Regions:
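N-terminal intrinsically disordered, cationic/polar leader segments
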Residues: 1-88
Length: 88
């Protein structure tokens, strides 16, 4: 899927994550999380797996995590990517 515009999904509420996807070259992740020290690698892996499943290869993502579960992170990334993309 090609990312053609900026789109977001999620909230800044506790146990949620706000994901913003915008066009870019390669995959660039900017992760801000209250649990980054403990779960940063798991968050990054969940995002990369979700993008791979959607065939997204060029995008910049900004995540503002408030302790979201992996399933929530995956759902927010997928929703934001589909909103930003073409060829869904």
């Amino acid at each position: 899927m090609k990312v053609v515009k900026t789109a977001s999904a999620g909230t800044l509420e506790s146990n949620d994550v706000l994901v913003t996807v915008e066009p870019g070259e390669g995959i660039k992740l900017d992760i801000e999380s209250v649990v980054y020290q403990q779960f940063g690698q798991a968050i990054r892996a969940t995002v990369m797996d979700t993008l791979a499943a959607l065939d997204v290869t060029d995008a910049t993502l900004h995540l503002n995590d408030r302790g979201a579960l992996d399933c929530t992170i995956a759902a927010r990334v997928e929703t934001a990517a589909r909103r930003a993309g073409e060829g869904v």
